[in-house]
Amino acid sequence: MDQEQERGISRLWRAFRTVKEMVRDRGYFITQEEIDLSLEDFKVKYCDSMGKPQRKMMSFQSNPTEESIEKFPEMGSLWVEFCDEASVGVKTMKNFVVHITEKNFQTGIFIYQSGITPSANKILPTAAPAVIETFPEASLVVNITHHELVPKHIRLSDAEKKELLKRYRLKESQLPRIQRMDPVALYLGLKRGEVIKIIRKSETSGRYASYRICL
């Protein structure tokens, strides 16, 4: 195996780990063992005898934890798929949408290598009421939420959001905003109208919280 291929596998392994962390951070059940999978074990499990990654084998399902279901009753199961094809066309995306809808997944996460055609992107809304999110592999090699300058973000439930607005006598329009395409919003799968609590460290008071609504 040449150095370039070795580097490619290492990047894919890191992206796989980030996806597992992302799914866990959204409140789905992922074991620490899955996240701690070593590069060598990853190669054994997901590469063929020639050392080529078999992305289809990396796909997985995850269900919400009991704690998450209590907080977000509408939260259903999730399916993550890594695409073998370099460029994603209509047929591949249609197959993915069919899989998500037929198996009644609430969320589908589709991870691609280099690009998705505009025609394939137009198919995504047909999965409704399920939500399909797409991520390029390269965006997942590093987990952005682990950066020391990124504060902790926590998604609020509807009840917590109502309590927040009531406590501070605010309307939704008065809350600071976070764009749906913000990297952390994408990581957490935030939807329009959802509120996140951001916990920052403060030199004077230890920690302080602020809130943003997703638009």
Swiss-Prot record:
Query: In which compartments does the protein localize?
Result: Nucleus
Q: Which InterPro entries match?
A: Arch_Rpo5/euc_Rpb5, RNA_pol_Rpb5_N, RNA_pol_Rpb5_N_sf, RNA_pol_subH/Rpb5_C, RNA_pol_subH/Rpb5_CS, RPB5-like_sf
Has UniProt tagged this entry with the keyword Nucleus?
A: yes
**Gene Ontology MF term list:** DNA binding; DNA-directed RNA polymerase activity
Which domain of life does the UniProt lineage start with?
A: Eukaryota
Alphabetical GO CC annotations of the entry are: RNA polymerase I complex; RNA polymerase II, core complex; RNA polymerase III complex
Question: Pfam family of this protein, just one?
Answer: RNA_pol_Rpb5_C
GO BP annotations of the record are:
transcription by RNA polymerase II; transcription elongation by RNA polymerase I; tRNA transcription by RNA polymerase III
Q: Which key words tag this protein in UniProt?
A: DNA-directed RNA polymerase, Nucleus, Transcription
UniProt lists the family membership as follows:
Belongs to the archaeal Rpo5/eukaryotic RPB5 RNA polymerase subunit family.
Could you describe the subunit structure of this protein? Component of the RNA polymerase I (Pol I), RNA polymerase II (Pol II) and RNA polymerase III (Pol III) complexes consisting of at least 14, 12 and 17 subunits, respectively.
What function does this protein fulfil? DNA-dependent RNA polymerase catalyzes the transcription of DNA into RNA using the four ribonucleoside triphosphates as substrates. Common component of RNA polymerases I, II and III which synthesize ribosomal RNA precursors, mRNA precursors and many functional non-coding RNAs, and small RNAs, such as 5S rRNA and tRNAs, respectively. Pol II is the central component of the basal RNA polymerase II transcription machinery. Pols are composed of mobile elements that move relative to each other.
Q: What is this protein called?
A: DNA-directed RNA polymerases I, II, and III subunit RPABC1
